């Protein structure tokens, strides 16, 4: 089916266009697609011409299978709507096929085909015979012209019968086509096709009986259906008789009788008469004279009873035929000696019983019975006088000497009636045989012996040989006691006295018994004679008694005769009433049966409709599957046909059957073709190599030898051409001379007529001049009228055109103005938008300049802060006391066990596990989004310029610094997962050298980290709408690595997640739920100070922020983790015992040993921590009790903590107890110094954040894929330290990279087991919260 949809009207038009150019096959394909289309399942009027054209093309191209498919489709379309259209189409199709066949028959000289079976035209015998005997042109023409059309016509009949079978709506058409098919078989003498046709009709009849429940099934009880079937079977019987196919005729007779038995009502008399007539012919042709005569008896009685207008002549003819047929029944029994010996009596009886059933007889007929019926029904009185005495001569009278002479007269009369009585001629041979047999029987009763010549003279109508044969047959079959003596040429009768006749011996005219019979019947004869003698000698009283009894019987009859007569009349009346009652009952029963049948049909029809709907659904499903298969097969077949048309494809697939080719894969076919192509190419190259050596020499030798021969042939041809030209030239000259002489003669003869011709022409012109002038005048008048009318029309038309043109131009002008107005408005909008964008760009540039100015001032202030820190560090170093430092070693150890690790330069716990390629990819995807939000929080809430610079509607591409090692930012629509993979067990995305603790969770209500007298505006207002990218209801703390030894995330009391502290955790007590203090930090910590309890600002990150500290990832500052413990050019000066020393002691517990801090610093740290705990207890009493429990646990753990091994590196197990409660409070002067340091560092950090943001916008382009894969901000700690050390002005010492890597690998191996327990849960939560969205520029945004 085509991929496009075509309407039926267009398809018919397309087909006609193809036919106009002589392309019948494409036209047929177009119509075929329409008929097979599922779109056209409802009948329309256009379908009928399409179907007629389709069938016409099928007939022209002899495509019987396509015609069959089209007819079946058309039947499905119009069966429920217009069945008459189907009948017209089928009749037109058969008419076209018959016309084509007749035309081929007229062109062919072969009237009757000698092909036995059209389905098997070429038999091995015919091929061999044609090869041996040869085939002339006419035979081949006849075979090519007539045979295909005859075969096509036969297939058309068979297909139409299959199409219309078992359909009550087209039953009449079915029988008409069947009768046409019988005529076709009879016309072309197609015996094999006749047999197939009979078998098909018989099969259709059996299917009718099996499928009688269908909605369109044929009801054989319907009289019309029965009559049509009987009519068709009678045509079949007649055709079989005409073609002398007696076996098929006998089967037809059985079919007809079967139809009779199906009917409850008797068939029509005319039909039965025709049936008996045909059956009699069949019986006679089959040699069964007994049933032939019986059939004629049935026909005779039927005609006498049913035909009211039977004439005397017809009565005589029928009676004569019945008499001759009855007398023609052989007297000899049909059973032979072989049948008697083989005991075939049962088979013969069964055969006769079946034949009797066909005639409606209860028992098989006999010759004697038929003769008695003929006499009883007075058939002889209607027989013609010439034949009337034949019965008496053969069956009654005993006159052997005159028998043959009398019969000969009758036979001669029969022979003289070939025109009037043609059917009587067939009985003459049988009558002659029966006459000879009667003669022999009568002669045997008279003569004991007779000469053969004498017997021959008594039978004049046969010769001696036929007579001798008849005698032998009579002796064998008729128990005739005769012996032939060839020496004396005599016949002897009754010489064997021991011979016993059979019971079924023929009986005829009888004169006396034979001697053997007399001996056998002697006792019987004696018995009969004695009975007669007894009657003679019987006494008189016995006779008197008999007479009295007779008289009593007569008197009794006379007495009761009237009463008996009345009883008989009453009985007749009773019988009549019973008949009427039975008829009424029959009518009532038929009516009830009809109603019941209608109800059953209605029920069957409903069930059939439901079944059809179900089948339609199933067929639709199967059709879809079949269409896919057909499309695939069609593609393969088309490809195969294209390939096989080529010489290469024919060779490649010559050994493969077409059925196998359909199952092959197109790739296999292509491979096969390529293989064959390569094979032929190789063979060709080999042949060329073999021939190229010899072909040049051979060609040169041929040409050298051809040169003299060509020259000589050229000279000979030139001489011949010259002679031919001279001869033709002479003939031309002679011919021209003769023609000139004849032309001169004609001229002289015609010149005498010149004057007469001129006179005739002049008269003719004069006569026609007036007529010409009159017509010219009329023409000029009409011309003037027409010119005037056309000028008026042209004027009116031009006026209308000018009017139309005016309105059209006016409309176009209005449309043009409207378009110009729209264009002008669009240009104005674009101009305003462009001005708006320029204004925004200008404002943005101004903000950038202001930011640069602020940054320059901040940078200058930063330098001053760093210089001040350096001086303070030197002062503190000079103020340290070596003795107090030595005494405070144990306090340093105590402070080393704090529950938060301080900044450690060489520690690996913040760096996380070693990076791998798959982890770096996922981290690169997550980092930009967090970094951008950090910048949003760091810029402050009241700085509108900084806020506008990070608005999401800013469509400019963000840029980054050239030294930025971070991955590319994501766009708002990027839907990639987090940059951390599902197995990423890293603690945080902050740098490995960042020692700041994470931000607190959403319930952080601590006060500001600024001093109470700090009058600077807050970094964000309380109404700052820039919230965290975490949801407000998520109460989890920031995510931490496995090596993070800080306390658990602070949250509400409803946090259902279990703690990740192990049972052996010996860390210090946790702080209260509302603890807002920052961790203990060193003086070199560049983050802002901790907040006090009065600051209730919302955390800079949302409650769900799982990132590390908000220190910028591209912070180019040198790590300050262990700088206090190492000698360097600058260290901020503080008094001993501060909290920075405590943090450094905590770092040393995780790194290599170094000198402990003074005890004064530890005391000061303890005082500071106690102040914070007091503030916490005042804010939340409930959390205070929990914190006290944890502190007691931490003190207990701290008391039993082992001292640190000073000998080398070690990894701390669980957190050791902290001594932060034992630190002493420092004076207010040191606290103010530290607060100022934190303010300075905060300003410096904000300045760097703004600088990074500006650099990102100004320098970075859109992220490339190579950058996303390569540029990762998760650099190794030692590499980043090296880079930052080079950029920073004050040089600092960095721990050796080798040691950092070793520690990293060691911590990775030891932390792997601890991370496995909670890693999967964390990854699943990350996947649930993550939704990556990618915009058009390649930016990815992670939405939670």
Curated annotation (Swiss-Prot):
Mark the residues carrying the PTM N6-acetyllysine: 68
Q: Where in the cell is it found?
A: Cytoplasm; Cytoplasm, Cytoskeleton, Microtubule organizing center, Centrosome; Nucleus
Q: Does the keyword Ribosomal protein apply?
A: no
Q: In this chain, where does the modification Phosphoserine occur?
A: 492, 584, 895, 949, 1028, 1149, 1159, 1223, 1300, 1326
GO MF entry, a single one:
receptor tyrosine kinase binding
Q: Where is this region: Interaction with EIF3B?
A: 664-835
User: Quaternary structure?
Assistant: Interacts with KRT7. Component of the eukaryotic translation initiation factor 3 (eIF-3) complex, which is composed of 13 subunits: EIF3A, EIF3B, EIF3C, EIF3D, EIF3E, EIF3F, EIF3G, EIF3H, EIF3I, EIF3J, EIF3K, EIF3L and EIF3M. The eIF-3 complex appears to include 3 stable modules: module A is composed of EIF3A, EIF3B, EIF3G and EIF3I; module B is composed of EIF3F, EIF3H, and EIF3M; and module C is composed of EIF3C, EIF3D, EIF3E, EIF3L and EIF3K. EIF3C of module C binds EIF3B of module A and EIF3H of module B, thereby linking the three modules.
The entry's family comment says: Belongs to the eIF-3 subunit A family.
Q: Could you identify this protein by its name? A: Eukaryotic translation initiation factor 3 subunit A
Organism the protein comes from: Mus musculus
Gene expressing this chain: Eif3a
